[in-house]
Structure formats: structure tokens, C-alpha cells
């Protein structure tokens, strides 16, 4: 199958490209980080439009991962700003219009935060879900996917990568919060497997089902810090900031996805894999 991965340089996009190619698939990459002309925000411009349409016309399936996003540090600073909202609404509007015109099958990656009405990021992803449903595509809610992150601004790092970098480079992990807030963390390879599995059964998946891609295990941020500090034999400290991104909300994910796929990588094993990438 010929796949087009939108956001192919991202935390999930890059491993997904590798996963697909390892499976013998043809993959077209698209990301403004690899080419400034590959910018979904500006598909109304001739050069950008031509590049995108050449890739779109020649693919069999699209993974729509592209989004202006980062970890909690980034979201807490940026998600209420005009540029954050405008970037994401623009890229969705342009991309969904052309997906509709060329009638391509696709999966849009949303987030569990689309159920959190206080979140601008979650609301933007919710709009993407609505677009997707209107085109009879598939959208999935990703739960705190983690994996190695390279060539990324520090403010965009996700919490596990941020802690690993701090432990390795500074011999200390300084948490921003008390660490009591809990998340469900999923290793990126498991996420890639879930996405490809869904692409293979795309036409038979019930569109009324909620598809949450998660480990289905709650872990506190302090537990993550403790695991990483034990690996690097360093200390960790607690912070005073509040969880302004998710407000300590804990929605339980729907488990419909488990009919098609199951997570394999434990949190400890996943963290060890990340550490090995940085050592």
C-alpha cells in the first residue's frame, strides 16, 4: 500500500514512517520541518499546492498527524494564543478540503483531550474529529504517546523525554508540579502498530465506535520521575505548579480498540528504550 504521512517528522510521524517501510510499504513523507514548502497552512499557494497534490494523488491512504503541538510546557504557554489556533485551524481546513475533493481514505489522530472543553488544543482536535466524521474517515484519540524526540525545541518536549534529558544532562529531574497527576502513557511503537492495524481494516471499522489508543494503565508523573531517576541514579524534586493543561481530569478511555489491537510495551521497558537512544 502507498501511504502518505502528514507530519512525518513528528514524534509519532517519524517512527510511523520507519514502521511502515519496515513492513514493506511505500511511504510518502510530508512535513514543513523537512521542507518549508510542505506546509499545510498554505495550500492556497501554487508551489505548496502542487507539492501536496502530487503526493496526495499518488497515495492509497493518509495518516493525518500534522498539528502544531508539544508537551505540557508548550501547551500551557501557547494553546491560548492566536497563532496556535490559527495554525491548526488553517492546516485542518486546507487538508480536509483536498481529502474530500480526492476522496482519499484517512485516519486523523486526535487526543483524549478532545473531551476536555477547557482546552484550546482539545477543542481544535475535536473540530478535526467532526471534519473526519463528515468525510466518513477514522479518527482515533491518542493517550500520551511517548518515544525518542530528536531535533526538537526543549519547550515542545513531552514529559518522559524531558525527564530523561534532564536526568542524563543535569543529573536531576525537576518536576514542574507535585507529580500527583496521572496519565496513561503509550510507547510510540505500539501506537504505530495500532494505526497500521486500523488502516488495514479501515472499511470494516464501525464509525460509531470511539477508538482510544492507550496503554489503559494510569501512572502518576512522580512514578515516571522515580523510574527515570532510578535508571540514572539521580534525584528528582517536586514543583509547585498546577496541572493547567489537563486540570487533573481522569476520563476512562473506551476499550473498543482492544478488539483490533492491544498494547505490548510496559512503561518501564518503554522508558528504557528511550534511555538507550540518548546514551
Language model features with spans:
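NAD(P)-dependent short-chain dehydrogenase/reductase
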Residues: 118-122, 126, 130-183, 188-196, ...
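Conserved Rossmann-fold NAD(P)-dependent oxidoreductase catalytic core, especially the SDR/UDP-sugar
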Residues: 61-64, 90-123, 138
Amino acid at each position: 500500500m502507498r501511504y502518505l504521512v502528514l507530519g512525518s517528522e513528528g514524534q509519532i510521524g517519524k517512527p510511523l514512517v520507519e514502521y511502515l517501510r519496515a513492513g514493506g510499504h511505500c511511504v510518502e513523507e510530508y512535513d514543513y520541518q523537512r521542507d518549508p514548502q510542505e506546509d499545510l497552512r498554505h495550500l492556497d499557494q501554487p508551489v505548496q499546492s502542487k507539492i501536496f497534490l502530487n503526493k496526495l494523488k499518488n497515495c492509497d491512504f493518509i495518516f493525518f498527524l500534522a498539528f502544531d503541538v508539544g508537551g505540557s510546557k508548550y501547551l500551557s504557554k501557547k494553546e491560548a494564543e492566536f497563532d496556535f489556533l490559527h495554525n491548526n485551524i488553517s492546516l485542518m481546513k486546507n487538508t480536509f478540503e483536498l481529502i474530500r475533493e480526492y476522496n482519499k481514505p484517512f485516519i486523523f489522530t486526535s487526543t483524549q483531550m478532545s473531551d476536555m472543553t477547557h482546552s484550546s488544543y482539545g477543542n481544535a482536535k475535536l473540530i478535526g474529529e467532526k471534519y473526519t466524521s463528515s468525510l466518513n474517515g477514522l479518527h482515533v484519540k491518542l493517550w500520551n504517546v511517548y518515544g525518542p524526540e530528536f531535533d526538537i525545541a526543549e519547550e515542545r518536549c513531552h514529559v518522559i523525554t524531558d525527564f530523561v534529558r534532564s536526568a542524563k544532562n543535569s543529573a536531576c529531574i525537576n518536576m514542574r508540579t507535585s507529580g500527583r497527576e496521572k496519565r496513561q502513557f503509550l510507547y510510540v511503537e505500539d501506537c504505530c502498530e495500532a494505526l497500521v492495524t486500523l488502516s488495514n481494516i479501515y472499511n470494516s471499522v464501525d464509525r460509531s465506535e470511539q477508538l482510544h489508543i492507550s496503554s489503559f494503565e494510569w501512572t502518576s508523573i512522580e512514578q515516571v520521575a522515580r523510574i527515570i531517576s532510578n535508571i540514572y541514579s539521580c534525584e528528582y524534586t517536586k514543583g509547585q505548579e498546577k496541572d493547567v493543561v489537563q486540570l487533573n481530569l481522569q476520563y476512562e478511555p473506551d476499550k473498543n480498540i482492544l478488539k483490533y489491537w492491544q498494547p505490548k510495551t510496559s512503561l518501564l521497558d518503554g522508558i528504557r528504550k528511550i534511555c538507550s537512544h540518548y546514551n
